[in-house]
Curated annotation (Swiss-Prot):
Residues 1-24 form the signal peptide. It is found in: Secreted. It comes from the Eukaryota. Its main location: secreted. Transmembrane segments: none annotated. Serine protease inhibitor that inhibits plasmin (IC(50)=43.53 nM, Ki=3.6 nM), thereby acting as an antifibrinolytic agent. May act in a cooperative manner with the serine protease Bi-VSP (AC B5U2W0) to promote the spread of bee venom under anti-bleeding conditions. Belongs to the venom Kunitz-type family. Negative results: does not inhibit factor Xa, thrombin, and tissue plasminogen activator (t-PA). This is Kunitz-type serine protease inhibitor Bi-KTI. The record marks K40, G41 as: Reactive bond for trypsin. Residues 30-80 form the BPTI/Kunitz inhibitor domain. Keywords: Disulfide bond, Hemostasis impairing toxin, Protease inhibitor, Secreted, Serine protease inhibitor, Signal, Toxin. GO terms for biological process: venom-mediated suppression of fibrinolysis in another organism.
Length: 82
């Protein structure tokens, strides 16, 4: 049982270090959530998805977004990709 606990602890630590390393390399504005905003517009935009490690398309409503909001894929990749 002691060996299982140690193995589990090592897995958790490795995962935590991997997430920390990726987060440290990505600019802080790219770690923000993909905010659709509160308005009802329909604007295709791109934002960095920290869990997927890449830029993805989402729909922006037109207001109350954040800095993780780019007009095209290239803009997002230039700003956020590591």
């Amino acid at each position: 049982m002691n060996h299982k606990f140690i193995a589990l602890l090592l897995v958790v630590l490795c995962c935590a270090l991997a997430v920390h390393q990726v987060s440290a390399e990505v600019p802080s504005h790219c770690t923000l959530s993909l905010a659709t905003g509160t308005c009802k517009g329909y604007f295709p935009r791109f934002g960095y998805n920290i869990e997927m490690g890449k830029c993805v398309e989402f729909i922006y409503g037109g207001c109350d977004g954040n800095a993780n909001n780019f007009r095209n894929l290239e803009e997002c990749q230039q700003s956020c990709s590591v």
